[in-house]
């Protein structure tokens, strides 16, 4: 018997077409907090109502975020049971860890089930699981717990990514693209889940960066099914992933970051963050779309991680974008806050639903080509070129 050539073996292993997003699912905790009443709630549950001047400043911060409402896991009842979470810097990691190890996989499972339901395939066909979260570090990891909750095959190939933050929603699509295109018939379940339990803490007059986090972050999970060569009549493509790249802005590691300590997770942000991101997005776009010949960024649809209102304003101004381009990202941010790695999946879900509701020609607001952007600590910029499908 003639031995198969290495080239033939590799060809047989690879998919024929590009990686394709086949379904999107999202989930949030049940507890909805309106932004206009959140300052009263926050200062009450942290026993800080005597800090009236600081509360007034926090109220102004909440208004400036442009967030209308957020979903959060923590409730007054949970905080009463674990009062250390309400202090500013009391050692409390064990209390926080006890919560996230259990709750991160649970919320992730809700989003994953929604994506799997839309996809319509059998869980036994899921070959890979890629999961990211800032919190929930444990052994076995949150990926193991999620696979157990979903009843995924024992042979599913799992990859867990911890402590990465906002850009990882896009980064996981880069990883899923490589998996799907290099493993024929692979179906990749991609899940991002963020719960702010690690970073919740009481207010302090000396730490306005911590207050900024309390004003803007929300809890949520997003999931996608990614695979190449969709089964006709069974699987319904939403977007093709045509390319995916990452770049790191030099000498920017101090612009945004977090540190895991006994007190939980602490964040820092530099005021120059919006400008740094806006100044570097253009180069990433130019490199990504050069093979396609697109140079006008108003001729593509946008699935962008919002970050915050100032970041979107800076990108819009720097690139000369029409207001409609980031409208979906702004809408998601105002309705859910910054859910870090999961946010961009909510943006994609909103875009494809809005495109259908408004009778657009494609899932990309009527346009063929688009970009999915993520940015996070590093500063790391993820650029994913998408091709929409007809509606």
Curated annotation (Swiss-Prot):
Temperature dependence: Optimum temperature is 45-55 degrees Celsius.
pH dependence: Optimum pH is 8.0.
Disulfide-linked positions: none
Associated pathway: Secondary metabolite biosynthesis; flavonoid biosynthesis
InterPro entries in the record: Chalcone/stilbene_synt_C, Chalcone/stilbene_synt_N, Polyketide_synthase_type-III, Thiolase-like
Active-site annotation: 166
Pfam families in UniProt: Chal_sti_synt_C, Chal_sti_synt_N
GO aspect biological process, one term: flavonoid biosynthetic process
Keyword line: Acyltransferase, Flavonoid biosynthesis, Transferase
Keyword Transferase on entry: yes
Claim: Acyltransferase is one of the keywords in the record: yes
Enzyme Commission number: 2.3.1.217
Catalytic activity: (E)-feruloylacetyl-CoA + (E)-feruloyl-CoA + H2O = curcumin + CO2 + 2 CoA
Record-level Gene Ontology MF annotations: acyltransferase activity, transferring groups other than amino-acyl groups; curcumin synthase activity
Family, per entry: Belongs to the thiolase-like superfamily. Chalcone/stilbene synthases family.
Function: Catalyzes the synthesis of curcumin by condensing feruloyl-CoA with a diketide-CoA in the curcuminoid biosynthesis.
Subunit structure: Homodimer.
UniProt name for this protein: Curcumin synthase 2
Annotated source species: Curcuma longa
Gene: CURS2
């Amino acid at each position: 018997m003639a031995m198969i050539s290495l080239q033939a073996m590799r060809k047989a292993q690879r998919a024929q077409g590009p990686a394709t997003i086949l379904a999107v699912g999202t989930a949030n905790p049940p507890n909805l907090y309106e932004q206009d009443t959140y300052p009263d709630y926050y200062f009450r549950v942290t026993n800080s109502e005597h800090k009236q001047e600081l509360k007034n400043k926090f109220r102004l911060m909440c208004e400036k975020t442009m967030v209308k409402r957020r979903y959060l896991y923590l409730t007054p009842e949970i905080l009463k049971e674990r009062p250390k979470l309400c202090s500013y810097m009391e050692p409390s990691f064990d209390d926080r860890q006890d919560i996230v190890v259990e709750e991160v996989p649970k919320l992730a499972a809700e989003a994953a089930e929604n994506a799997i339901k839309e996809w319509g395939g059998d869980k036994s066909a899921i070959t890979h699981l890629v999961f990211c979260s800032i919190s929930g570090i444990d052994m076995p990891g949150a990926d193991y717990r999620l696979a157990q909750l979903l009843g995924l095959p024992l042979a599913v190939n799992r990859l867990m990514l911890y402590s990465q933050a906002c850009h990882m929603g896009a980064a996981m699509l880069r990883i899923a693209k490589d998996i799907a295109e290099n493993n024929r018939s692979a179906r990749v379940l991609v899940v991002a889940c963020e719960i702010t339990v690690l970073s919740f803490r009481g207010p302090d007059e000396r730490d306005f960066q911590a207050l900024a986090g309390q004003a803007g972050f929300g809890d949520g999970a997003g999931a996608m099914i990614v695979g190449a060569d969709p089964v006709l009549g069974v699987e319904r493509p939403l977007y093709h992933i045509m390319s995916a790249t990452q770049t790191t802005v030099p000498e920017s590691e101090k612009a945004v970051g977090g540190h895991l300590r006994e007190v939980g997770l602490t964040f820092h942000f530099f005021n120059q963050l919006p400008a740094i991101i806006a100044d570097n997005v253009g180069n990433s776009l130019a490199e990504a779309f050069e093979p396609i010949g697109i140079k006008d960024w108003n001729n593509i649809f946008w699935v962008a991680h919002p970050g915050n209102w100032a970041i979107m304003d800076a990108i819009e101004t720097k690139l000369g974008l029409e207001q409609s381009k980031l409208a979906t990202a702004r809408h998601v941010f105002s309705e859910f806050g910054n859910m870090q790695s999961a946010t961009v999946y909510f943006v994609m879900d909103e875009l494809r639903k809005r495109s259908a509701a408004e009778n657009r020609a494609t899932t990309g607001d009527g346009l063929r080509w688009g970009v999915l952007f993520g940015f996070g600590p590093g500063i790391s910029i993820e650029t994913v070129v998408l091709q929409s499908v007809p509606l």
